[in-house]
């Protein structure tokens, strides 16, 4: 067994990122909702400015996990933070510390932007993962709800200038 390595993803890693995101959608039983593509990852993640960054965990050049994140700013804190959009570790690689390692590497990367916190959301059906996050120090914020605007309502607001 080779050493587990973490690296900042490059455009050449877009197919591996896509493959891991596809597996994540399957694990969450959300394949029908997943409409990402390698092209979209290349376009939005590796252009200037990038819409997201990614950290990959691998062993012997085989991708085992990833963290996809972007920077945000809290007006209430007056500080920058990270929002982890997706964190995924392949089932056979769980329990090896990759999830915490991916978060740690994202935080290291975020030091370039003076981040002081990490924000993320967990699917309601993903109780095992919720326990993982709580074990490493995340706390649940009960005074917020996640809302989404897309499709026709989004188009109506965009078109009504």
Language-model segments: which ranges?
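Conserved GNAT-fold acetyl-CoA-binding loop/helix
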Residues: 18, 22-44
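A short beta-loop-alpha structural element at the N-terminal edge
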Residues: 5-17
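A short, internal acetyl-CoA/4′-phosphopantetheine-binding micro-motif in the GNAT/acyltransferase core
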Residues: 87-94
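Conserved acetyl-CoA-binding loop-helix of GNAT-fold acetyltransferases
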Residues: 95-108, 135
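A short helix-loop-beta-strand connector motif used in the catalytic cores of GNAT acetyltransferases and
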Residues: 44-56, 83
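A short, polar/charged loop-to-alpha-helix boundary motif
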Residues: 74-80
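Conserved beta-strand in the GNAT
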Residues: 56, 62-71, 83
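C-terminal "cap" of GNAT-fold acetyltransferases
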Residues: 116-161
């Amino acid at each position: 067994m080779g050493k587990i390595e973490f690296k900042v993803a490059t455009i050449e890693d877009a197919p591996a990122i896509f493959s891991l995101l596809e597996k994540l959608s399957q694990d969450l039983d959300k394949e029908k909702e997943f409409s990402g593509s390698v092209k979209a990852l290349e376009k939005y993640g590796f252009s200037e400015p990038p819409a997201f960054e990614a950290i990959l965990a691998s062993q012997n050049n085989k991708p085992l996990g990833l963290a996809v994140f972007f920077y945000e700013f809290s007006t209430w804190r007056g500080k920058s933070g990270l929002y982890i959009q997706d964190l995924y570790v392949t089932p056979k690689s769980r329990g090896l510390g990759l999830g915490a390692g991916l978060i740690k590497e994202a935080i290291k990367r975020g030091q370039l932007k003076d981040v002081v916190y990490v924000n993320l959301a967990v699917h309601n059906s993903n109780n095992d993962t919720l326990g993982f996050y709580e074990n490493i120090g995340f706390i649940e914020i009960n005074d917020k709800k996640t809302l989404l605007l897309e499709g026709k309502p989004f188009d109506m607001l965009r078109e009504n200038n």
